[in-house]
C-alpha cells in the first residue's frame, strides 16, 4: 500500500524503482481482475437465477407435497413485541401450516417476564404455579415448541434445541430426507414466500438433484428512525449479499451462512453437528481460537459444511428468500458490532486460506478470496488520493481517475438494477457508500486489531474476565458481557482452569472427545466428504406424510411415562426427567414417597393396581385429562 500511494517525491524516491514498479503492476492487475471477473460472475448468476420476492412455485403446496421445515429461533433478552412479530412472520408464511414446526428456545431456565408474556401471546395461561421446560402450543395452526435451557450462549442453546429436534423426529428421519432446518434470529421478519422459495431451490425445482446441503437468503435492514448510518447499512447489506455472496455462489460456495437466515438439510446438519458443537469455550487455547469458534460461529459452521460437501455448488445463495432485521442505530453500537464481526471473519479467513482441502475443492473461490484479502489494506486509498489532490502533492493527471470511474460505474449500475428490481430506491445513493465505506472499513479493521481482547502494551486489562477453579469459561464470558465488552477476556486461562476443576472434582469422563490432531486452525480430517446425496424413494417421494402431520407431542416421544413396579408405583429414571427442573424433581420425589406410604398402609384386597395402570395414567383419565390439555393447547 505504501509504495502505491501518491506520496511526495521526497518520500517516494526512497523506494527501489524495481520494487515500486512490480507492486504497482501487481496492484493494478489485482484491481482489474477483482473488478471485472466478479462483476461478470454476478451478471451470470443474476441471469441464471431468480431475483425478487415473487412466488416461484406455481402449483399449490399441501400437507402431502411440502417438505417439513423446522424453524430454530434462539431467544435471549428480546422485546416481547419484537419476538411475537418474528413468530408471526413465520406462521403467516405462504406454506402449509402442518409442515412448519417452530422451536422457540429461551437461553435461560428462569420463568421471567419475557417468558410469561410470550406464553400469554401464544395463548397459554400465565396463572399456572409452574411451567415445564418444554411446552407444545398450537398457534394459528402451527406447532410451536417453547423450551427453556440452561444459559450457555447462542450455540449452546442451538445444541440443546438440536438434540430435542433429533429426538422428536428420530423415527421419521430414518426413512425420509425431506426435513429442513431454518436458523433465524428472534428479531428477524421473514418474507411471506421465504420458506417456499428456499424449499423450491433446495428440493422442488424441476430437475432438482436434491443434493443441495445449505442455502442462505437475502437479509435486508429495517429501521424506525432513518439516519446516514442506517442508510449505509442498508446499501452495504444489499451490495454485500447480492454482489459478493452471489459471486461466491458462482465460484462454488458461499463462505458465510449467517445465523439470521440459513436453511440446512437436516440430515447434513445432523452429520456435522457433533463437530460444530464439539468446540467448547473450555477448549480454546488463545484469543484466536475463541474468536474463530465463538465470535465467528457462522463462518465456522460454513467451513465445516464446505469440507463435508462432496462437490461444489452444494452451498449456495437463494436470491428469492428475503428477511428483514433491525439496523444498528448508533455509531458506538455499529463499531462494537463490526469489531466482533471482523475478529470472527479474520480468524475464519485464516482457517479457510490455509486449508488445502478447500483449495482443492473450490480453487476459484479461494483464489478470489485470497486476492481480495491482499488488497484489503488499500481500503483507504481513495481518501489518500483525495488528500493528495487537496494538498497539491499530486495532480489529477497522475491519479487513476478513469479506473476509479469505471469501478464506481460498474458497481453503481448493479445497484441501480437491484434498487429497481427490489423497489428499494434508496440504494441508488450508492456513490455515498463508495465514498464513505472505505473509511469505515479501514477504521473497523484497525480498531478491531488494536483492541482485540482489549490488549494493552502490558497485556490484558486488569478487569479482563478470566477462568479459574471457581469460574467456568462460560461464566467468564458472561462477566465480560456484563462489563460491556465481550472480548475483554483471557482465553488462555480456560484450559488450565478446566484441568484444575477436573482434578479437584475427580470427574474424568469415559468418552473420547473430538479433538484436532494436526492443526489448530483446521477441522479434523474425518470431516472431509461427510455429506452424500439424499436417498431417493421411487414412487413415494414423501413417504409417511401422515406420520409427519400428526407427529406425537414431545412428551409422548419414546414413551416418556416411566415404568411401574408390581404395586403400581411410578419408577424413576424415565426420559421425562430430562424435561423436569430441580424443583419439579423435588416435588415428584415427595409425591412418590407419599404414594408409597399410602400403599403400604392400604390393605391388600380387591383388584391390583396394575389393572388400573397397565395402560399408563392417561388410560384412566382419557376424557378428563386430555380435554383439559387440548383446551389449553399444552402437551407435557
UniProtKB/Swiss-Prot annotation:
Residue segments, region Disordered: 595-636
Cross-referenced Pfam families: Chitin_synth_2 (PF03142)
Catalytic activity from the UniProt record: [(1->4)-N-acetyl-beta-D-glucosaminyl](n) + UDP-N-acetyl-alpha-D-glucosamine = [(1->4)-N-acetyl-beta-D-glucosaminyl](n+1) + UDP + H(+)
Annotated GO MF terms: chitin synthase activity
Entry's Gene Ontology cellular component terms: cell septum; plasma membrane
First-level EC class: transferase
Tissue distribution of the protein: Moderately expressed during appressorium formation.
Entry's EC annotation: 2.4.1.16
GO biological process: one example: chitin biosynthetic process
Keywords: Cell membrane, Glycosyltransferase, Membrane, Transferase, Transmembrane, Transmembrane helix
Protein function: Polymerizes chitin, a structural polymer of the cell wall and septum, by transferring the sugar moiety of UDP-GlcNAc to the non-reducing end of the growing chitin polymer. Contributes to the production of conidia but is the only chitine synthase that does not contribute to the ability of fungal conidia to germinate. Involved in fungal stress tolerances.
Family to which the UniProt record says this protein belongs: Belongs to the chitin synthase family. Class VI subfamily.
UniProt protein name: Chitin synthase VI
Biological source species: Metarhizium acridum (strain CQMa 102)
